[in-house]
Amino acid sequence: MNKSLILGIVIGVIFFSAIYFFNKQPLTQKNPLFSELQAVVYKTPTCGCCKEYINYLKANGFSVEVREVSDEELENVKKQNQIPADLWSCHTVFLNNYFVEGHMPVEAISKLLTEKPNINGIALPKMPSGSPGMPGIKLYPFKIYSVKDGKDLGLFMEI
């Protein structure tokens, strides 16, 4: 092989390794605010990314209770808590009288618990690439929405 081809391969490996390494969600220092809270996660038994998100919560200091439910039961939990369907994700977390829908970064949870807004919860819709518990690279800023009484109140924050 010629030197240019070998150099190209080496640079490619370094480049893709750097993307993989730097995209990993860094663990924040455990927040004492989180250690006193019980996060209750509703998820289906077959969801692998939910398991990764639960590990993320635990690594950030949360005490986590997992409730595995059927798809229908999970949908009912979302409906009973008036989470708009267009903001749904694969799991729902309840903590401190709020719901947290989706693969939410701890920065948003910290803001929610610190500011204590008069809302029912926050949502990061769908399952964005690179969000906590999800594989891939972050393709765009995460838009997190406030919800009250079944209504999307707009942007809570962007990360």
Would you name each region that the model predicts?
Residues I54-L74:
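Conserved helix-turn-beta segment immediately C-terminal to the redox Cys motif
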Residues T46, Y53, S70-E73, P105-I109:
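Stable alpha-helical elements in mature extracytoplasmic
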Residues M1-S4:
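Positively charged n-region of N-terminal signal peptides that target proteins for export
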Residues L7-Y20:
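Hydrophobic membrane-insertion alpha-helices, especially the h-region
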Residues A18-Q29:
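Hydrophobic single-pass membrane-insertion segments
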Residues P32-N60:
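Local sequence-structure signature of Cys/Sec-based thiol-disulfide redox active-site neighborhoods
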Residues Q38-V40, S63-V64, N96-F99:
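Short active-site oxyanion
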Residues K79-I159:
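Thiol/selenol-based redox catalytic cores and closely related redox-interacting motifs
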